C-alpha cells in the first residue's frame, strides 16, 4: 500500500487484517498540535480522543472497561496482597517491574483510585525500594511476585514515573491521608 502523505483528521476506523490468529497494536500516533500552555497552568487537560470526535460518555465507558479488564478481569495484571498492598505483574515474564508498578500508580491517580494507588506504593516501598546504601531511595527494577528481588539495580524510567505519579497524588489527595506523597517523591529525587 502507498504511504499516507497527509494524516486523516476526525473519527477514523482502524482496520487490522489478521494473517495469524492474533493482532497486536504496538503504538498509534495522533497528529495534534501542542498547546501553548499545559494543564497545570490552564486547569484544562487535553483529551485527544474527544478531539478526534469521540463522545465523552463513550470515552469514559471505554476507559472504565479497560481499567476493569486490567485490574479485575480474568486476564488482570493487578493483584492484591494482604490488607493493604498490591502489585502489577508483568505476565509475560512472571515478575513485578518498576515500570509496571509506576504505570499502575499513574493509572490509579488519573482515575482517582486512591486505595489501589496506596496499595501499589506500599508494595513498591516494602519490596522494591532500597532503604540504605548507594541506591537508597531508588528501586530494584525487578522482583518476583513474592517480593524477592531479581535485580538490585534501578531503572530510571520507573523512578521517573514513581515521582510523577506521587506528585500527581499529592495534588489530588493531599499529603495528610496516611502517605505524604510529596515527601516520598522528594526522597526519590534526593
Where are these regions (language model features)?
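Extended ligand-binding groove/face enriched in aromatic
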Residues: 73, 126-190
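Aromatic- and histidine-enriched alpha-helix N-cap/loop-to-helix transition segments
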Residues: 92-103, 112, 153-164
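Residue-level detector of short, conserved catalytic/binding motifs and their immediate flanks
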Residues: 12, 26, 102-105, 160
